[in-house]
A protein has these predicted regions:
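Domain-length accessory/inserted modules outside core catalytic folds
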Residues: 1-69
Length: 69
């Protein structure tokens, strides 16, 4: 499974937790749920409003669900 190119962003402000993109760092422009196409699924992540323990300057987005494409 290939990670979307915008995961592991060079200037991230959010980290993805759970699901197939766990640990990926990305940049979001609005604090709203985001989706990523991964293989034959669309994975949805939602913001928690919390900072990450591993990356304390990044906001946490948690895996919500996946839907087939």
């Amino acid at each position: 499974m290939e990670r979307p190119r915008f995961v592991d962003h060079p200037d991230p402000n959010a980290v993805l937790r759970g699901g197939p993109l766990n640990g990926g760092r990305t940049r979001v422009h609005n604090w709203v749920p985001v989706d990523f196409h991964v293989g034959d699924e669309t994975c949805f992540y939602r913001p928690t409003g919390e900072l990450d323990a591993q990356y304390p300057t990044l906001n946490v987005y948690v895996f919500d669900h996946a839907e087939p494409v």
